[in-house]
C-alpha cells in the first residue's frame, strides 16, 4: 500500500488533539496501542562510535540545546531552543563530574565547558548508548534516544509533549507567565517553530526552572 497523507495538515494535529503518531494511524485506520519507534544499531556502528568519541573515565552527558534548519532566519528560536543562560548553567553544574557532549551544527551557539559533537546521524546515534545523562529540546535527539529505549529530560516551549513527546521522559514545561499572544506570522500552527520574535508570549526569557531540570537529570 502507498501512504501519502500528511498528518501535519490534519485538523486533529493542527488543533493538537492527540499525539502525532495516533493522528497518523487514525488517518489510515491503523490500530495504535502506544508503540514507539525502535532503532537498531549494529556492532560495527557501535564500535566506530566508541572510536570517534574515545570514552575516558568520565560519564558522558549528551546535550542538545538548539535545532532547526540551517537556513532559518535566526540561529536561535525562542519557540524551540533552550535559553542560553539555562543551557550554560546546566553545563557549568555538570562539567566537573561529566564529560558533556554538545550536539550542534557548527553555525549554532557555542557553550563553555562542553565538547561539540558533529557526526553523521547514524554515527551520532551510536554515541547515545554511551551516555549516562541526556538533556534535549524538542528536536531529533529526543526521538533518537527514545527509539533506543533511553530516557531523557526534554525542555518544551511551543510544542507539547502530549503531541510530540514520550511518557517515559521527564518533560519540562516553561515556568513563565504568558502575557501576550500574537499569531500573525503562523500558518497551520499556533507559533512559528523557527521563532519569530514578534510572537514571543512570555514575561521573561529564562523560561525554565534550572533546579527542576537538574533534579530530573539526577534520576537518570
What name fits each language-model region?
Residues 1-220:
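Catalytic machinery of carbohydrate-active enzymes
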Amino acid at each position: 500500500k502507498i501512504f501519502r497523507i500528511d498528518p501535519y495538515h490534519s485538523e486533529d494535529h493542527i488543533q493538537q488533539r492527540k499525539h502525532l503518531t495516533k493522528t497518523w494511524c487514525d488517518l489510515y485506520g491503523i490500530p495504535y496501542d502506544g508503540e514507539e519507534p525502535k532503532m537498531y544499531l549494529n556492532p560495527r556502528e557501535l564500535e566506530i562510535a566508541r572510536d570517534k568519541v574515545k570514552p575516558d573515565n568520565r560519564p558522558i552527558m549528551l546535550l542538545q540545546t538548539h535545532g532547526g534548519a540551517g537556513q532559518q532566519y535566526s540561529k536561535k528560536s525562542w519557540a524551540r531552543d533552550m535559553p542560553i543562560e539555562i543551557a550554560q548553567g546546566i553545563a557549568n553544574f555538570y562539567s566537573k563530574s561529566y564529560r558533556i557532549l554538545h550536539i550542534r551544527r557548527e553555525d549554532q551557539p557555542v557553550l563553555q565547558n562542553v565538547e561539540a559533537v558533529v557526526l553523521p546521524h547514524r554515527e551520532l546515534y551510536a554515541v547515545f548508548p554511551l551516555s549516562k545523562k541526556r538533556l534535549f529540546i524538542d528536536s531529533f535527539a529526543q526521538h533518537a534516544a527514545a527509539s533506543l529505549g533511553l530516557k531523557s529530560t526534554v525542555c518544551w516551549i511551543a510544542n507539547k509533549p502530549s503531541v510530540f513527546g514520550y511518557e517515559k521522559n521527564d518533560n519540562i514545561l516553561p515556568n513563565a507567565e504568558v502575557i501576550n499572544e500574537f499569531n500573525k506570522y503562523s500558518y497551520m500552527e499556533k507559533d512559528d517553530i523557527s521563532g519569530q520574535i514578534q510572537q514571543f508570549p512570555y514575561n521573561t526569557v529564562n523560561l525554565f526552572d534550572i533546579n527542576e531540570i537538574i533534579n530530573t537529570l539526577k534520576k537518570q
